[in-house]
């Protein structure tokens, strides 16, 4: 029996690595933490007065706008909008399942 010859590996489709050296392993980022907003869940006198005086003058009125400007929760902003609608201070522009858009009431 003849001794076996060492066979060369078949040529692969990938090119051979050119000795690049060791690369540093990428670290995971810590991720950004969103700042907690401490919005009110009930109206106090000053905020309610501000709502009645300033909100009807806004060109665009949505629950998110009121929540951001008056520092109130989203559910309280929706209730405030219903109150302003009942008073006739604002009028509806568009209503959708997830977003309601209002504007100031004009004398038309």
Swiss-Prot record:
Gene3D superfamilies: 3.30.63.20. GO terms for cellular component: cytosolic small ribosomal subunit. Keywords: Ribonucleoprotein, Ribosomal protein. This is Small ribosomal subunit protein eS25. InterPro entries: Ribosomal_eS25. Disulfide bonds: none annotated. Belongs to the eukaryotic ribosomal protein eS25 family. Pfam families: Ribosomal_S25. Residues 1-36 are annotated as: Disordered. It comes from Solanum lycopersicum. Residues 22-31 have a biased composition (Basic residues). One of its GO terms (molecular function) is structural constituent of ribosome.
